[in-house]
Amino acid sequence: MAMLSQPNDGHDHPEKKDPDTTPKQVAGVISSQDPPHPAKDVAEERARTDWDLKEMHEFLEGDEAKSEQILRLYQSIERDPILQTRPEQFDYTQKQERELVANRINQMTKFLETEPYGKFRRRLQLMTVIDPSLGIRMLVNIGLFLNCVRGNGTQKQFDFWSNKKEAGIVKQLYGCFGMTELGHGSNVAGCETTATFDEKTDEFIIDTPHIGATKWWIGGAAHSATHTVCYARLIVKDVDYGVKTFIVPLRDSRHSLLPGIAIGDIGAKMGRQGVDNGWIQFTEVRVPRFFMLQRWCKVDRQGNVTLPPLEQLSYISLLEGRVGMATDSYRIGARYTTIALRYAVGRRQFSKKAGEPETKLIDYTLHQRRLLPYLALTYAAAVGTDRLERQHEELLANLDIALAKKDKLLLKNTITGTKSMFVDSGSLKSTLTWLAADLINETRQACGGHGYSSYNGFGKTYDDWVVQCTWEGDNNVLAMSAGKTIIKTVQQVLNGKELKDSTLEFLNAAPELSKAKKAVIRIRDHVDDVDRVLKAIAGLISKFSKDLIPISYQSWDSIGAQRVILSKLRCHYYLLETFNERLNDKIKAKSPARPHLENIIKLYYVTNILGPFIDEFLRFGVISPQVAKYITYEYPQKLCANIRPYVIGLTDSFQQPDNFINSLIGKYDGNIYTNYLESVKDVNDPSNYKAPYSEALEAMLNRSALENRERSERGKAAADILSK
């Protein structure tokens, strides 16, 4: 160490040394040797899991076979170099995203050719969660297009377009769904594209008479589709028979537009930039008469039109999309509650006392109240949407059998089932897609600033998701329709009709429930009784509907908001009923999973049904006022405290792998900060520290003095000269 020079003043001075700059260990000072350990926190909480994850996953998915198939498909997807996710994909431009989707479609069609269709549908369902653009671009063909042909066409027509023309494996033909128009969306019956029969040539002339009839939002139309199933008004001998469906070719074998077809891209959207949504205009486009789908409505060579009484079944093709979106709500919910709860366990903020470790986010009661009700909802949605899928598959199978065998009894029961399915799918699709949108947004906010990073998935998924609330049935329109059916059903039951072969059979109790004077839930113990809670929901639906019947005679529109509430209540009854039945059927009393599922089901109905609709329950006297505070405040907090220690195990039970979750802060290992920083560095090379637009920044920072840029024309020297 160098010595300081001594002053030469004739006196002795003690030797002076340089100050000691060696770091000292001082309490409370941050040490580089002690970084945060979120992975340790997550691992410790994972060790609390005291149930079999396999049993829990089978409970969520419905059975062992489906659970095993889901897990193997996850594995297949994350191993596939084209289908797997990577952080850099969050930075893709629209052009890059569409190219990625096109490559993924190509890859997916190889599975479509070789594996059973049921397995492929499950694969596509999973891919739709991580790449919604891929999902919709494939589903417009194998879902909407082919389901419309199947539901509206004859068996020979379906065989021709699906098998001979190979639309079923997306080969030769790529179909799109030409329903919505610039001027009409939800009101399909109001579509104005025309299909006029020319008896001389045995052709239909498809035409867009004005701008409002331009087909709009047509997925796949801009670049991909070779054909469309066009919803157009059937006009024969100057008579308008309403909207029917027609196959219309759009492009030739070289993918060039056919004469009379005008198509364009509708441009940038809020989300799903990988989908080539387009507009279509037809100018006197001629198609053969047999290009009209004629399972229900028929037009013969002489222009005679036959309209069968079962034509309402033609809209059954729309059900698969609604069922699929309800199921997507479950998987989206599982993905984002997993991310948010892993982060909430690994992330610490603020100390309760100086010198103590910071508190985990999940240990704050507000954080529990924000996230755990969504976790419970996701469990309920898993079980309920599995039932809805199976119900839909059975309905389609019975319809095909009934029509093929001309079995009138089975057909009658199928029609009843179809009516129920329209209510069930409409109420579940609308309610769950709304709730999933709320879930994504709330879980994002619960992750603070890091939730705003694209690499953690929330932003893109939210932008991609919310279209679910307005397509294939606008949620408010669907909910009002379901609510209207519920009111009419209650009215029929009050008039003496008994419901059979319907999922609305619980409304057979409406005469008794609607007149009940005593509240169903009167004391705290009643809130723990699931059967009593189901009775309370049925009672509210019955009383609410009965109250609305006189108003409906005057105007259905004036009770639109109430119809939406009834639809939501019907959805929740469906989910709770299904959850309760499966819990009792599949989980044994001594199973370690059972107490956790009992807490989950209670938190679900307390925070998603009884609490949000407490005003209605109180207004109609279904719940006593003295238990309202317990329901809305005290009991939810108690249930959250019971569930809190097991949040990692409860989200692990979804069994979603890291590649599927696709979030840097939501990985299984819980190593939030390392995963985040290293991936961000990989995607954004730190050596590229100069921006492409650095020249503009440097010009701004290094600009010359204002006086020089004004050529010294405004300075004092110039003023002295010019003022004389």
UniProtKB/Swiss-Prot annotation:
UniProt catalytic activity: a 2,3-saturated acyl-CoA + O2 = a (2E)-enoyl-CoA + H2O2
EC number: 1.3.3.6
Pfam families associated with the record: ACOX, ACOX_C_alpha1, Acyl-CoA_dh_M, Acyl-CoA_ox_N
A Gene Ontology biological process term: lipid homeostasis
Source species, domain of life: Eukaryota
Database matches in InterPro entries: ACOX_C_alpha1, Acyl-CoA_ox_N, Acyl-CoA_Oxase/DH_mid-dom, Acyl-CoA_Oxase/DH_mid-dom_sf, Acyl-CoA_oxidase, Acyl-CoA_oxidase_C, AcylCo_DH-like_C, AcylCoA_DH/ox_N_sf
Cofactor needs: FAD
Cellular localisation: Peroxisome
Positions with biased composition (Basic and acidic residues): 9-21, 37-48
PANTHER family: ACYL-COENZYME A OXIDASE-LIKE PROTEIN, ELECTRON TRANSPORT OXIDOREDUCTASE
Entry protein name: Acyl-coenzyme A oxidase 2
Organism lineage string: Eukaryota, Fungi, Dikarya, Ascomycota, Saccharomycotina
